[in-house]
Amino acid sequence: MTIKAAIFDLDGTLVSLPIDYRALYAEFRKTMGIQDIEPITKTVAALNEALRGKVFETWTMAESAILPKITIVKEGTELYEQYSEIPKALVTMQGKKTVERILSTLTLSFQVVITREDSLDRAAQITLALEKLRLKPENVIVIGDRETDKAAAEKVGCKFKMVKK
């Protein structure tokens, strides 16, 4: 099948965000009032809207603090260039404000952007991107840096390319 679109992950694939997750998770534990918060995406998804909003606010503040320290992932940006002639989507667990700030400073653009505010489940994020791109999964490649990205792409039926760290 012909590749008609590429879906990229952000952190670890196109850029590296040096977030101190140990400190961030400690803040999450305080905010949520529970100790067992992993897997974080499932825990946050199960929260009521008000508490999830507080967690997202804390998360966005942590992301904003490290934005001056982000670095480019060479292999990921080379793949971005390789797929420059086809539509591209971005799926990320970063927040909308963070993504807007990152994309405004880099020369990267996407027809579709799906953030944690849209879904905290990677397979659901990919499915949303496919719907917005109006493409079948077998015509799309997902590019990510984690086994969870690969599993989500395969679950949805997309091809997958791993960016090495």
What function would you assign to each model-found segment?
Residues 65-100, 104, 123-124:
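Short, acidic loop-to-helix structural element flanking the phosphoryl-transfer center
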Residues 96-141, 147-151:
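Substrate-recognition "cap/lid" segment bordering the active-site pocket of phosphatases
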Residues 51-63, 107-112:
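Short, basic/glycine-rich phosphate-binding loops at helix/coil junctions
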